[in-house]
A protein has these predicted regions:
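Phosphate-group recognition and catalysis centered on beta-loop-alpha active-site segments
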Residues: 25-309
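Bacterial N-terminal signal peptides
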Residues: 8-20
Length: 309
């Protein structure tokens, strides 16, 4: 049966394609192969993430880069592989080594995603440099663990990196300050206290704030943050009972983001995931995060009978 969301998903596809503005619109691309985003100033980043209305075009986020085509999560290879095919920004995970170097690693331990063993915090950076990353199937790749600074420098002029903050603020804050609080670095914020701390350090940093209820929204409204700097993570799906929350966020120009990582991304095959990606939703999200950003884009293209090289 033809999905009643077909016309709406046309908007999704338009967003996925338009999000990666050509070099002429977004500034000269550092790599002509990559589908870059307009990220060279806080003004450009704010405008890119600003919610404008119900016909607004959703944005795609790669969760930890991507898990596709043998790419290990939280790797430069995953970022580049994705941007060579679709425009996206990336949620990444900073963790600190024993000698206070911030690296990209989701888990507190090395075992699942690397050739190492034990807690990240019990190893030095020199030790971690000798390891190799594994893909989602456990296959060892040639990729090494990147530092956060390497990821930030690589993504400059290309895309936004959204840091899920596990690293102590006393370490992450000074690191970002030393780098000049780059406009393409976004911070995932869980509490009003975190928001106030980082906003005091830089008023030109974008936040991805967890706001899943009106009570949480009201708590963040008591902080001095600039709502032009905010995208809201509202949960794994948009819920009809939370319409008032979404309306209040959007009235501030704030986009509402969902993550498919805990839902459809967990399905075993591309066909099963595609079915989930294209299933009906009562309310269309403004930002969609997925472990499989390329699959998601191609599923939407397939629905519309579109082809992309």
């Amino acid at each position: 049966m033809k999905s009643p969301l077909g016309p709406i998903l046309g908007t999704v596809l338009a967003a996925v394609l338009a999000a990666g503005l050509p070099a002429e619109a977004a500034g000269k691309s550092p790599d002509a192969r990559l589908r870059t985003l307009p990220v060279n100033s806080i003004r450009a980043v704010r405008e890119y993430f600003r919610y404008r209305g119900p016909s607004d075009m959703p944005i795609v986020s790669g969760h930890r880069g991507c898990r596709e085509d043998g790419c290990p999560e939280n790797s430069i290879r995953a970022f580049e592989h994705t941007l060579c095919r679709v425009p996206a920004f990336f949620e990444i995970d900073p963790r600190m080594t024993r000698d206070s170097v911030v690296v990209l690693m989701h888990d507190p331990t090395l075992d699942r995603t690397t050739t190492g063993h034990g807690p990240v915090s019990e190893h030095t950076w020199a030790e971690l440099r000798e390891l190799r990353l594994k893909d989602v199937h456990g296959n060892v790749t040639d990729e090494r663990i990147p530092t956060l600074e390497e990821a930030i420098r690589w993504s400059a002029g290309k895309t936004v990196v959204n840091l899920d903050v596990y690293t102590p603020k006393e370490v992450l804050g000074p690191l970002l300050e030393r780098l000049g609080f780059p406009p393409h670095v976004m911070l995932t914020i869980h509490t009003p206290e975190q928001a106030e701390y980082y906003y005091a350090l830089s008023r030109k940093t974008m936040f991805s704030i967890h706001i899943k209820s009106l009570e949480q929204l009201e708590a963040f409204e008591k902080t001095p943050i600039d709502w032009r700097n905010v995208m809201a993570y509202v949960g794994p799906r948009m819920l009809p009972e939370n319409r008032e929350l979404y309306e209040r966020l959007r009235a501030k120009g704030v986009r509402c983001m969902i993550s498919l990582a805990p839902t459809y991304d967990r399905r075993e095959t591309p066909e099963q995931r595609r079915e989930g990606y294209l299933s009906d939703r009562d309310i269309l999200p403004d930002v969609i995060e997925s472990d499989y950003p390329i699959e998601l884009t191609r599923a939407l293209q397939s629905l519309l009978g579109e082809e992309r090289p």
